[in-house]
C-alpha cells in the first residue's frame, strides 16, 4: 500500500474551497491513510518556503502555452503528502487531476450563506484586496504575513476570477456556487465525491474504497485559529496608523536636537 501510494503521488485532491469543512477532511484523510494531507494551514504553520514555490507554480501555469502545471514543482510541494485539499491546491484541481491520473476528487460542500458568513469573519473580509499603507505593509512583512497574504489573494483570484469584487456579497455567493458547478461539470462522476462533512465516514470511505475507522468522524472548527490570524492583521493595521506620525515626529525631534539646540 505505502509503495503504491508513493508511486501514485496524490491520491485525493480537494476541490472544495476554504470554510467548507476542509480542516475536518484533512484530519479524516490522515486517519485513513496514516500520512499527512496538504492544507493551507501547512503553509503558515510549517512550510513557509512553499509560498515562493506556489507563486512560481501559478506564474508558470499562467504563462504556459499548453496550460500544463509544472510537474517538478508539484512533486517538490507535495513530497510526503498523500492528499492536497483547501487553498491553494483547490484552485488547481483540474491540472492536478491530469497530473495524477489515478487520484480522486472530493468536493466539500456547504450552504452558500453559511459559507460566506464564515469567510467574512475569517479568511475573506470585504477589504482583503484593498490597498494598504506602506507602514502596514512594512509591519506585515516583518512578521512574515506579507507573502502569505499575497499568495492567498492570487489563489482567490484564480478561483473567482480577476474581476471579482470581494466586497460584494452577491458576487461572492455567485462565485461560490459557480465554482462548485464547474467542479461537478469538469470532473468525471466516477472520480468525484460531493461531500458534506456532516455525512461522516460512510460516503467518504465508500468512495475511497477504504474501511470505516473505529472512531468518530472528526469535526474540527478552525474558526478560532483563523480568527487569531485575522486579529493579528487587525493589530498590525492599528499599529501602522501610529507608525508614520511617530516616525515623522522622531525625525523632527532629531533635526531640532541636532541643528537647533
Predicted segments with their positions:
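PAPS-dependent sulfotransferase catalytic core
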Residues: 1-72
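Glycine-rich phosphate-binding loop used to anchor ATP phosphates in small-molecule kinases
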Residues: 75-100, 107-108
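Short, well-ordered alpha-helical microsegments
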Residues: 22, 90-94, 116, 201-204
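Short His-Asn-centered micro-motif
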Residues: 14-16, 40-41, 85-89, 109-110, ...
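Terminal signal-anchor or tail-anchor transmembrane helices
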Residues: 235-261
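PAPS-dependent sulfotransferase catalytic domain
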Residues: 34, 42, 63-78, 88-91, 94-194, 210
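The conserved 3'-phosphoadenosine-5'-phosphosulfate
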Residues: 46-50, 106-116, 178-237
Amino acid at each position: 500500500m505505502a509503495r503504491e501510494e508513493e508511486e501514485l503521488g496524490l491520491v485525493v485532491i480537494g476541490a472544495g474551497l476554504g470554510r467548507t469543512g476542509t480542516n475536518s477532511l484533512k484530519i479524516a484523510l490522515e486517519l485513513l491513510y496514516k500520512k499527512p494531507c496538504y492544507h493551507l494551514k501547512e503553509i503558515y504553520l510549517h512550510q513557509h518556503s512553499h509560498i515562493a514555490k506556489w507563486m512560481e507554480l501559478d506564474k508558470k501555469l499562467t504563462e504556459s502555452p499548453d496550460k500544463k502545471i509544472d510537474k517538478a514543482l508539484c512533486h517538490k510541494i507535495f513530497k510526503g503528502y498523500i492528499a492536497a485539499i483547501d487553498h491553494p491546491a483547490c484552485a488547481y484541481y483540474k491540472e492536478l487531476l491530469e497530473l495524477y491520473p489515478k487520484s480522486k476528487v472530493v468536493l466539500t460542500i456547504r450552504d452558500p450563506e453559511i459559507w460566506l458568513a464564515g469567510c467574512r469573519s475569517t479568511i475573506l473580509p470585504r477589504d482583503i484586496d484593498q490597498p494598504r499603507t506602506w507602514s502596514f505593509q512594512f509591519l506585515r512583512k516583518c512578521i512574515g504575513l506579507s507573502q502569505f497574504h499575497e499568495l492567498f489573494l492570487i489563489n482567490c483570484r484564480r478561483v473567482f476570477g480577476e474581476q471579482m469584487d470581494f466586497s460584494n456579497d452577491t458576487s461572492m455567493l455567485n462565485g461560490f456556487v459557480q465554482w462548485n458547478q464547474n467542479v461537478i461539470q469538469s470532473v468525471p462522476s466516477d472520480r468525484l465525491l460531493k461531500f458534506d462533512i456532516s455525512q461522516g465516514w460512510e460516503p467518504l470511505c465508500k468512495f475511497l474504497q477504504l474501511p470505516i475507522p473505529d472512531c468518530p468522524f472528526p469535526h474540527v472548527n478552525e474558526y478560532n485559529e483563523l480568527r487569531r490570524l485575522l486579529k493579528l492583521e487587525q493589530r498590525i493595521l492599528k499599529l501602522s496608523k501610529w507608525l508614520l506620525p511617530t516616525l515623522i515626529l522622531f525625525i523632527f525631534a532629531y533635526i531640532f536636537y541636532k541643528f537647533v539646540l
